[in-house]
Amino acid sequence: MNIEEMKKIAAKEALKFIEDDMVIGLGTGSTTAYFIRLLGDMIKKGEVSDIVGVPTSYQSRLLAIESGIPVATLDQVDAIDVAVDGADEVDPNLNLIKGRGAALTMEKIIESRAGMFIVLVDERKLVDYLCQKMPVPIEVIPQAWRAIVEELSIFNAEAKLRMGVNKDGPVITDNGNFIIDAKFPRIDDPLDMEIELNTIPGVVENGIFADIADIVIVGTKEGVKTLER
Ligand code: 5RP
């Protein structure tokens, strides 16, 4: 099984948690894109009804509309029943790093409010500790980026401003901010680090998602595996 197939079987497994009348947080990224398309197919076939999707980014909003999923913003719904999203790293306690797609702030706002947060990954994303392979993305107020990069050196982080691809200059988030990618030596206490990073003035949100995932569905070469907290 290749990586795309692993992502797809994880996405398919998540459909088992979807019921009529649900408000669903729609994450960002290539794995969640499979879920959004499959959810759209379910709606078209009449297998589920009265679904509302709350997208976490322009990417997921456009894809949800294209897939025939009715969408709303967070302030238009009373509650989020379930949220489904990908991740860049998952540690053994199901703490996450997210934000490669620069959508971490809306993802955290929506997913922290969900009745159930389901994470979809392929087996490459499982790590022994956070920051083993990937940096922590940090959304920052543009003017503050240099001061924050300097401040991150206290944590021995290698931090750099994320630059655009097919765009000159830095990546601009859906909220009009910059992203700093900070590679820490390792993160032993994700909750503590998540809180600490958010106390730096100018930081809008960071990509450590500690103690928030309820279920992680992993696509592996052998099939799908479900991890629960
Ligand atoms: C976007 C994210 C993504 O969910 C994460 O980067 C995983 O993406 P993919 O499924 O494409 O590997 O956090 O901000």
UniProtKB/Swiss-Prot annotation:
Keywords recorded for this protein, A-Z: Isomerase
Binding-site residues for substrate, renumbered to this chain: T28, G29, S30, T31, D85, G86, A87, D88, K98, G99, R100, G101, K125
Active-site residues, Swiss-Prot/TrEMBL: E107 (proton acceptor)
This protein's pathway: Carbohydrate degradation; pentose phosphate pathway; D-ribose 5-phosphate from D-ribulose 5-phosphate (non-oxidative stage): step 1/1
SUPFAM superfamilies for this protein: D-ribose-5-phosphate isomerase (RpiA), lid domain (SSF75445), NagB/RpiA/CoA transferase-like (SSF100950)
Disulfide bridge map: none
UniProt keyword Cytoplasm, yes or no: no
Annotated GO CC locations: cytosol
GO molecular function per UniProt: ribose-5-phosphate isomerase activity
InterPro entries: NagB/RpiA_transferase-like (IPR037171), Ribose5P_isomerase_typA_subgr (IPR020672), Ribose5P_isomerase_type_A (IPR004788)
GO biological process annotation, one example: D-ribose metabolic process
Pfam families: Rib_5-P_isom_A
EC number assigned by the record: 5.3.1.6
Reaction(s) catalysed (UniProt annotation): aldehydo-D-ribose 5-phosphate = D-ribulose 5-phosphate
Top-tier EC class: isomerase
Function: Catalyzes the reversible conversion of ribose-5-phosphate to ribulose 5-phosphate.
Family: Belongs to the ribose 5-phosphate isomerase family.
NCBIfam families assigned: PRK00702.1 (NF001924), rpiA (TIGR00021)
HAMAP family: Rib_5P_isom_A
Quaternary structure and interacting proteins, as annotated: Homodimer.
Designated name of the protein: Ribose-5-phosphate isomerase A
